[in-house]
Amino acid sequence: LDRPNLIPLNAFVEIFTSLSVNEYKNVVMHSLQVAKFSRHLARSIGLKHHPEQVYLAGLLHDTGLILKASIENYDVFIDAFRNIPDLEKIVLTLDRKDRHSFISHLLASHIGFIDADCAKALTYHHTPFHQINDDENVALLANCIKAADTISLAFMRNADIFSEETLKTMIQSVEKDTGLNDEVKKAAIGTLKDVRNLVDLLDNETHFDSDVSLSCVEFESAAKLIASLLDLRSPYTRIHTFSVARITRQLTAELMNEIDARFMKIAAFLHDIGKMTTPLEILHKKGSLNEIETIVMRTHGGCNQESTFEVQT
């Protein structure tokens, strides 16, 4: 535990974005765009927050929506996340009172390597700038995330073909947003008119390359968040991953040193990540699986391996 540099921060971003399949495809891709736009806008207006921390906050800004929606009304949650690419409609359907913003803040706060102010900004990422009663740097960061959210939502509504009309719609969505600070709005419009940056900001690549490495303790908190998102996808696996992690910890406590035991617990939290590729129709099927369904189910083990990270020593 005294060895602080074991797991690359890049691994968390890669694992999080690997969830962008099936029901989580749109929300994770949206989160990735918000992460990149938030970082770019925060840099543009000269905010003091570290760019990597801004990126992570943007990446996690809607995790509270997944948690709230899945717990409160699972059937509506699955139907909406699977069939409605317009995430703004999902928010209006499942969270009219914007409670998910505070939940996202709480989730980010429990990840030890995310800056407290960046996590706090998530509380206000749907709040008009003039209504935020907090530190100005927090308010401006929240407004950058709000602008990034607005841009991404407009893009995803028209994402089949990126055309002149799509770009106009994105610019207009920013111009019409009365909740944006003038400086943030100007930076957002300028960004949309700069084709050099726009391609990278809208693609499906992470564009995240950090030199930071995390201890087992730090990464375990992030692995718990990933495990929560995995388990929330199906009521049949709601406590499965955490149960496996707890039992793994108990079994390894007497057999391994502390660091190796923690690595095993992290592996337990991530052991079913490949199951994201398995359709719910197969996961929830009553009775025996047919031959094809069995093959599909078994492929998730290979997907697990592709999604895991390399440990640096």
Regions found by a protein language model. Name each.
Residues 2-313:
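Histidine- and acidic-residue-rich, metal-dependent catalytic cores
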